[in-house]
Amino acid sequence: MNTNKIAFAIASVGVALWAAMIAVGAAGLPQMTRQDIPGVRNMTQVDPTIACAGATDASAIPEIAKRGYKAIINLRLASESGAEIDAARAAAAGAGVRFIHMPFEVSNPDESIVDRFIAAVSDAANQPVFIHCASANRAAALLMIKRATADGWDNGRAEAEARAIGLSNPSLRDWALAQIAKRKR
C-alpha cells in the first residue's frame, strides 16, 4: 500500500470519528427550532421554556405574548441603535408580559448579570421566557453559563447549544467560559 493510500485511509477514519462526535454532541441537545416572527431577528425556540433571539422590535411583542411567553429579558443597552427599551417596556405592559431589562455591555461585561439572569430564567413565573439582545450572542452566552452551572451540563454541550443559538463572538465565549469556571469551583 502506498503512502498516499495510507494517508487517505487515516484521514477518512479521522473525518468519520469527527462526524460521529458531532452527531453524539448534537444528540445531547434539546430539539431547537428556528422561529419566524415579523420584527424578530434570529429566533430559536431552545426548549419549551426558553427562546433566544436577536434584535426584537417593540411591534413584535404582542405576537410574542400570543405565543405564550410570560417574560421578555432584554439584554440590550439603551444606547444601542434600535434598542427601543421604553417602547418595548410599554408594549410588554400592554400585552401583559413581564419586561426585564438587564443591560449587558459586551466590551465590559459586569459579572453580576450572571446571577440575575440565572434567577430570572429559572423563575417558573417567567416561563416560557423570551431572551434577546441584538444578534443572540449575549443571550446565547448567558444561557451557556446557566446550562453549565445551574443545569449541570458539561461545558462542551452548553457551548454547542450556545453556538447553535448564535454565539459567535470569541471574547464573549471566553468570558462565558471564565464565568463557568469561577462558578464551578
Protein language model features and the residues they cover:
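A phosphate-binding catalytic loop at a beta-strand-loop-alpha-helix junction
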Residues: V129-A140
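Cys-dependent protein tyrosine phosphatase-like superfamily
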Residues: N2-V129, M144-R185
